[in-house]
């Protein structure tokens, strides 16, 4: 797990989610054949965020992309019959259907969910590609609209910044993200 995932996990915990990191989905051989690839490795969900009172689990893909151009809307809008690329769960409906169904069953088998648990796919991005002559945050807004239209959750860099800022108002904890928030926003520190 990388540090960016750790920050997102802390932000989710601050919003009353229980977080599980690097969850391997136990896709069966039969399910692998259903998605067109019989030798794929077990899919790994970066973060599972369980909100018990809502009976909801968000399966987060976490991409920092801080040293790259960032998440591109065009990459998320691609549709693949057989999964490929960096956003497989978002761009291949058949793969998503199989993996999320198996994930839900795995969670039920582990006592972490029940048949009524709502399972949602989410993306947290540390950086979003921004076109040169475009107002700031345009691409983030377009990505959010696109993902929400498909019933996915999207945390843009701006959303993450606001959540980090809100951490400054939390009581002190020996957590790097909370300490950093308190250093960056001392006026909000309690």
Where are these regions (language model features)?
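Intrinsically disordered, low-complexity Ser/Thr/Pro/Gly-rich regulatory segments
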Residues: 1-190
């Amino acid at each position: 797990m990388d540090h960016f995932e750790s920050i997102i996990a802390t932000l989710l915990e601050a919003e009353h989610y229980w977080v599980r990191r690097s969850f391997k989905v136990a896709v069966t051989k039969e399910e692998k054949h259903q998605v067109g690839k019989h030798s794929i490795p077990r899919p790994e969900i970066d973060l599972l965020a369980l909100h018990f009172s809502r009976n909801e689990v968000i399966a987060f893909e976490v991409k920092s992309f801080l040293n790259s151009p960032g998440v591109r809307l065009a990459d998320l809008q691609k549709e693949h019959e057989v999964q490929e690329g960096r956003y497989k769960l978002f761009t291949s409906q058949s793969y998503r259907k199989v993996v999320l169904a198996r994930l839900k069953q795995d969670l039920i088998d582990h006592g972490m969910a029940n048949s009524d648990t709502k399972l949602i796919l989410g993306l947290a991005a540390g950086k979003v590609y921004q076109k040169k002559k475009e107002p700031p945050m345009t691409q983030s807004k377009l990505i959010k609209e696109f993902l929400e239209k498909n019933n996915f959750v999207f945390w843009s860099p701006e959303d993450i910044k606001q959540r980090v800022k809100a951490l400054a108002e939390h009581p002190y904890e020996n957590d790097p993200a909370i300490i950093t928030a308190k250093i960056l926003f001392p006026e909000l520190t309690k």
